[in-house]
């Protein structure tokens, strides 16, 4: 095997130590989370920055057991689906753990969804109960399903004239006496624990079935570097939505099972994030590119004491080297890292190794322990050696079971040898670092050349007068497609289209040059921070 991890069989293997998974097939993600908690019972587990509530690991374990009995009394049985439609709070992970402790399947929906969008997900996942909040009740009252409203007794208002199927979170807790054990349900690692809907960048949203074993494996992959560095009792701020795999698996579950503390935030607001880092002495911050941009470019960052912060990690979309260096200047003494994962891989494929120190290379790091990969040529279907691009295929114990009710999509994504075809274009360098170039379907085809929008976007946001940017294809009779950009100017900037075109032309081959630049106030993005290029493509084409 080369130092890149590339083998003679065309497979890249992780350069990290071997992943050790629990051997007992009857291990649930909940029993695994609390396996060591008796040695730190009074340590902070969860703090809710919005309400001031907090729980130690001992209190968390008791609350989850009691809530599990409550859901059991409400009739939730093994394989029953429970939908949560709510923003982050300390009660969100309690519900996740309580539902999965009794063999239920936890599915999540974006609080920004319309009635129509929630309706589609309810039709697909068939939940028995909806967990939500007062503010969103109007969107779910028409589904004729029992509802549990999160919040405290004082803040939950049971809407007048509504049916008797509405309970508060406290009501569910009170259905059971304080208990120390969960209702007995036999749970296997291969059982489905969560049904998370993929962002649908390739079309309609699909329900990704993730097992107890997937969560356990992914959590060990995510936290192995902490073991290697001898780091304990970190404090992780979670404003990334817990309805998404990044917030739920990579931050919430992975860190709690490691004995780290979690600080929840209901929504992202830069000043509030900075205040909470200072207040809770946060050590680790996982973000998505729009937040990374804000941390790089906003002067308000300098007004807060961020001395506790050791790491900022970013995922969801590739970040360029220039932007990482800019962020490093704005927040010195913090290690900046990137990772790569997707819902289908329980949030992790690769992550940079903090033991290597500051690099800001623009890479998504080395394969997580236990993960194998291939880079497969889009033209020939053959495995590619280092520094050759192709589609990223991955395999490992963190890969999904499949898509719910969609055998065709499952078959198209997972092949007979268990490789998950990611649809992402990338390559490994000679040191085994993965570089994610872009989504294959989003590449711009210019006279047979391929132009990656993410590469041009990375160059654009490296300019001090540019706050954000998106690049999309524009139909062209001669070339097929040409790259055009939509740019958000920095405050007080008067940068012009010509200035931007010249700035890019100096740095790229002629076929990658921008043919047009338009100015917009906001780049459309998903809750996970991914650019919604399709929306802009559709807008542009509808005006042609």
UniProtKB/Swiss-Prot annotation:
Its main location: other. Both substrate-binding domains (SBD1 and SBD2) are involved in the substrate recognition, and are sufficient to confer the substrate specificity. Residues 269-338 are annotated as: SBD1. ATP binds at residues 198-202, 206, 338-339, 343, 424, 439, 530. Gene3D superfamilies: 3.30.300.30, N-terminal domain of ligase-like (3.40.50.12780). One of its GO terms (cellular component) is peroxisome. The lineage of its organism: Eukaryota, Viridiplantae, Streptophyta, Embryophyta, Tracheophyta. Keywords: ATP-binding, Fatty acid biosynthesis, Fatty acid metabolism, Ligase, Lipid biosynthesis, Lipid metabolism, Magnesium, Nucleotide-binding, Oxylipin biosynthesis, Peroxisome. Its EC number is 6.2.1.-. Its cofactor is Mg(2+). CoA binds at residues 267, 447-448. It comes from Arabidopsis thaliana. Disruption phenotype: No obvious phenotype in growth, root and flower development, fertility, reproduction and morphology. Contributes to jasmonic acid biosynthesis by initiating the beta-oxidative chain shortening of its precursors. Acts as a carboxylate--CoA ligase that can use various carboxylates as substrates. Follows a two-step reaction mechanism, wherein the carboxylate substrate first undergoes adenylation by ATP, followed by a thioesterification in the presence of CoA to yield the final CoA thioester. It catalyses: hexadecanoate + ATP + CoA = hexadecanoyl-CoA + AMP + diphosphate; (9Z)-octadecenoate + ATP + CoA = (9Z)-octadecenoyl-CoA + AMP + diphosphate; octadecanoate + ATP + CoA = octadecanoyl-CoA + AMP + diphosphate; tetradecanoate + ATP + CoA = tetradecanoyl-CoA + AMP + diphosphate. Residues 339-403 are annotated as: SBD2. Belongs to the ATP-dependent AMP-binding enzyme family. Induction: By methyl jasmonate. One of its GO terms (biological process) is jasmonic acid biosynthetic process. A motif (Microbody targeting signal) lies at residues 542-544. The keyword Repressor does not apply. Expressed at low level in leaves. GO terms for molecular function: ATP binding; fatty-acyl-CoA synthase activity; ligase activity. It is found in: Peroxisome. This is 4-coumarate--CoA ligase-like 7.
